[in-house]
Structures are given as structure tokens and as C-alpha cells.
Amino acid sequence: MVIKKLSLYLDTSVIGGYFDKEFEQDTRLLFQNIKDGKYDVFISDMTKNELNDAPEKVKNLLDGLEHRKIFVTDECEDLAEEYINEKVVGMASKEDCIHIATATINNIDVLVSWNFKHIVNIQRIRGYNTVNMKNGYRTIDIRSPKEVVIYELG
């Protein structure tokens, strides 16, 4: 049986997690899975912009990672506004909403994040997906790196 590779959208927290003691083990396993070709990876222009002020070692991580760049569009901004209008999250989380909307509109299978407060949170995920369906978009799977890492059978 041939299984299609999952497409992953990595938000900024995943890239920063590579050097964070709390998240590095699972993040590094995920990056190894990506280097091994197990996923199709997408990074938005917004993520790249958010990394502008990051330490060089964090910015350089993307250089060695095969990925495709996608762009935040007006459609993404509009869907992000809908998440806020529907009170899935507050206005302070607009950037998080833009990440989710960008992944949704680009038909990415899974948005991967370490942000448990505003993104990887069952109540929030249900809210985002309710808004997606109400507006004619498909649902999106939202997971932490720990949940998408492929462990070798042993």
C-alpha cells in the first residue's frame, strides 16, 4: 500500500524549538524525519519574517531543510479575521490565526506548532475548524512535533 506523504506547515515555534531544552528532542527528531524525506514541508513568508530577529543559528536551520515557501494572502488575512470575529481567540493572537489560515487555504495536511495556548489546543482546534467549515474550507489537523514524528519500528 502506498501512502501519500503528509504535508506539514511549520510555524515559528517549531523552528525555535530546535534549540530549546524543553522541545529540542522531538523537534530534532522531526527535522531528521524531514531530512529523510518523510514529509513535504511548507514555510510561510510570515514565518520567515518572524525569524528575522532570531539568532543566526535559528535562521540558518531553514537553509538545510527542504521546504516550499507559501505566502500570506488577503484570503488568509480574511480567514484569520473570521477566527477572531468568532472568538476562537482574541485579537492578540492574530499572527497565530494567520498561520492557521495560511495552512488551511494552502490545503496543508498538518500545522505543526509548540504553541499549546493558542494553537495546539483541542478547544481552539475545534473552533478553527468550525470557522473553516462555515466558510467553505476543509478542516486542518493541528499537532505538536511529538505527535507527527515517525519513530522507527523496533
What is each PLM-predicted segment?
Residues 34-35, 96-98, 130, 138-139:
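Short, charged/polar low-complexity linear motifs in solvent-exposed/disordered segments
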Residues 1-43, 49-61, 70, 85-90, ...:
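Short, well-structured N-terminal submotif of metal-dependent ribonuclease cores
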Residues 68-127, 149:
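Active-site neighborhoods of divalent-metal-dependent phosphate/nucleic-acid chemistry enzymes
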Residues 1-5, 13, 21, 48, ...:
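Acidic, PIN/NYN-like endoribonuclease modules and their adjacent C-terminal/linker elements
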Residues 44, 72-73, 143-145:
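Conserved beta-strand termini and adjacent loop/short-helix elements that scaffold enzyme active sites
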